[in-house]
UniProtKB/Swiss-Prot annotation:
This is Lipase member I. Inhibited by sodium vanadate. Glycans are attached at N63, N396. It comes from Homo sapiens (Human). The gene is LIPI. Its EC number is 3.1.1.-.
Amino acid sequence: MRVYIFLCLMCWVRSDNKRPCLEFSQLSVKDSFRDLFIPRIETILMMYTRNNLNCAEPLFEQNNSLNVNFNTQKKTVWLIHGYRPVGSIPLWLQNFVRILLNEEDMNVIVVDWSRGATTFIYNRAVKNTRKVAVSLSVHIKNLLKHGASLDNFHFIGVSLGAHISGFVGKIFHGQLGRITGLDPAGPRFSRKPPYSRLDYTDAKFVDVIHSDSNGLGIQEPLGHIDFYPNGGNKQPGCPKSIFSGIQFIKCNHQRAVHLFMASLETNCNFISFPCRSYKDYKTSLCVDCDCFKEKSCPRLGYQAKLFKGVLKERMEGRPLRTTVFLDTSGTYPFCTYYFVLSIIVPDKTMMDGSFSFKLLNQLGMIEEPRLYEKNKPFYKLQEVKILAQFYNDFVNISSIGLTYFQSSNLQCSTCTYKIQSLMLKSLTYPERPPLCRYNIVLKDREEVFLNPNTCTPKNT
């Protein structure tokens, strides 16, 4: 009986000694009103590791000692939210932490600056971003004393949080390892000089995703590489009517967050294409990624770091910003799959029209892609590339259904049109061998099914 009582007491003592989880500030509209008269700002650092995935702990203890779960030798991701006009907790926050820790054994620090971001006065929140950055710099200097390295720090900032990340980077003279800006806030930052906003000089590598550049985000490129999914605004799947309520305002702005999370959680390769404009991208002018050498096209999201070396080379000498474009689907995980169809017509042929095509696989599945350009001229022996987007990945392709549409003013029901060579290549998975067919004869508006073969090296 005494042993039983002793064990019960031990269990009670252990449970009593367990520290409570650190909770994200739960504010409300009342706090936004209160801020009108009594402004407050506070920065709370919530630390997560694989040892405390579901229970945040303070980064520093009350005696200013470093939390024993923090590993100075591992990567540290700093996750910084943006403006919170009514004090709500970011719905994506906990899932983001989970996905990061599932990807890599790291330290994750959520920067809770809700008391400073929760206000009806947006300009006040903007001014608070610099104060938060100064506060963070104090904690970072303390971490450095414990043996942490700036090179291992990856700041992920959402909206105003992106500019906070930039201000922190400026304090440390651009020595942070990486900053990712997720739709950096545009109002009060657009067209400002680099010292007043996030800039590529703020870290050794800065990647930015623009998803609401005509609204709450910013249009101009800020990083070593700037991704513009769906042109950087009007994201598919987002409400188009103001009658949709708050989602109409924030859906596009938050899409950058969800795209980055999807890049971690799924097998999607968010292949993106370096281009001067979204218009040029849609006309298939930018399907080559030769400037990225063996790495192929850049990938949006967490894996953008793979292109750090090439991008930094492009920035040496004169700043050569890299703007890249891609399209996504409208539902999570937003995957799309790119193919390019390359066509060469014989030296005695000139065609002026358009193609449509569909793919068939060995299971009998058929899918027709979204094509980006309807009509274009096909000149003698000049390769013309047609960019195609599929919503499902297509492997084990058995047949290509091809249809040619001659321009309306040149239609000829008895004419034939020759193709010297056709090559289909996956851009999403460039390691897959391209498929080819040669010496093809077509008639206007008549579909032909072609059984392609793996291209020989001289034709690729």
